[in-house]
From Swiss-Prot:
GO cellular component, as recorded: endoplasmic reticulum; Golgi lumen
Protein localization: Golgi apparatus lumen
Gene it is expressed from: SDF4
Binding-site residues for Ca(2+) 5, renumbered to this chain: D320, N322, N324, Y326, E331
Native organism: Capra hircus
UniProt record, GO biological process: calcium-ion regulated exocytosis
Protein name as catalogued: 45 kDa calcium-binding protein
Length: 355
């Protein structure tokens, strides 16, 4: 008996080590995705003055990744936090059916594409209002003298202060045009921010941002010009042949320069499949296999009613098991993970309970 256990015990550490290596390889092989609103964290002061990486109700992130929370953001709106994984299932099912009733405008116990479109536009407007309120508070943080304008130099001082630099010393150096002695990475971030600052500065440019211009700086989805700038940035990062358009192969590839993730590109079939479906069904409006800047801009514009209708149809199609082009209570509950991020069990029984 002892002679049999010895070799097995000796194998255990080896097996554990091998398992760890496999898990590590799998994790590093998958494309980076910083698209979840629930995963964002960081320095609070820095977050207040930096443009957010994630924009609620916008289909693509700033880095070109799909916003994996998008469907929940436009279906739940402010109620997103109520559907965390640890929420009580029965309570969550009831809330989901309350939302269903609100979307179902004609009370026929089914949701049409038009009803879903109106709901998406309503939830997007809520996100817009939240962004305006946040931007107003953040503007006050970078406009200490309260003159209603923020200069690029004022903003730069505040930004470097969040990076650990002494605010008074930085202000003095900028005033006297002395070397700031900042690292290369921070300098690159500053240059990108300055480009964005210029874009948000409405003609005639004076490098002074008003409160509304500062909103566009933080949230490009609020300004046609800044939305176009965001589209150009994304195409620049994904466009491999320099034609200022995107082919399917370019869109499903990782952005140029993310070398650490490219080895895992073929591994993550789900990531590629999702982007392929998005490209073919929603972004490439004329289905010619090429996405232009205009097409990408229409797709990314949160207040584009045509895009909202297409999105509504796609959301219905995903859960429409009886293929009648409507969403019914049973279908919404069964596909609750798609709509809320949480899987709610016993969906069939729940329909009768909640109605």
């Amino acid at each position: 008996m002892a002679s049999r256990q010895g070799p097995l015990c000796g194998l255990a550490p080896c097996c554990l080590w091998l398992l760890g290596v496999i898990l590590l390889m799998n994790a590093s092989a998958r494309p980076a995705n910083h698209s979840s609103a629930r995963e964002r964290a960081g320095n609070r002061e820095e977050n207040e003055i930096l443009p957010p990486d994630h924009l609620n109700g916008v289909k693509l992130e700033m880095d070109g990744h799909l916003n994996k929370d998008f469907h929940q953001e436009v279906f739940l709106g402010k109620d997103m936090d109520d559907f965390e994984e640890d929420a009580e299932p029965r309570k969550s099912r009831r809330k989901l059916m309350v939302i269903f009733s609100k979307v179902d405008l004609n009370t026929d116990r089914r949701i049409s594409a038009k009803e879903m479109q109106k709901w998406i536009m309503q939830k997007t407007a809520e996100h817009f209002q939240e962004a305006v309120a946040e931007s107003r508070a953040h503007f006050r943080a970078v406009d200490p003298d309260g003159d209603g304008h923020v200069s690029w130099d004022e903003y730069k001082v505040k930004f470097l202060a969040t990076k650990g630099h002494n605010e008074r010393e930085v202000a003095e150096k900028i005033k006297n045009k002395w070397d700031l002695n900042i690292d290369e990475e921070t300098q690159e971030v500053l240059e990108n921010l300055k480009d964005r600052w210029y874009q948000a500065d409405n003609p005639p440019p004076d490098l002074l941002l008003t409160e509304s211009e500062f909103l566009s700086f933080l949230h490009p989805e609020h300004s046609r010009g800044m939305l176009q700038f965001m589209v150009k940035e994304i195409i620049r990062d994904l466009d491999q042949d320099g034609d200022k358009k995107l082919s399917l192969s370019e869109f499903i590839s990782l952005p140029v320069g993310t070398v650490e993730n490219q080895q895992g590109q073929d591994v993550d079939d789900g990531w590629v499949r999702d982007r392929k479906r998005e490209f073919e069904e929603l972004i490439d409006a004329n289905h010619d296999g090429i996405v232009t800047m205009a097409e990408l801009e229409d797709y990314m514009d949160p207040m584009n009613e045509f895009s909202a209708l297409n999105e509504a149809k796609q959301m219905i199609a995903i859960a429409d098991e009886n293929q009648n082009h409507y969403l019914e209570p049973e279908e919404v509950l069964k596909y609750s993970e798609f709509f809320t991020g949480s899987k709610l069990v016993d969906y069939a029984r729940s329909v009768h309970e909640e109605f």
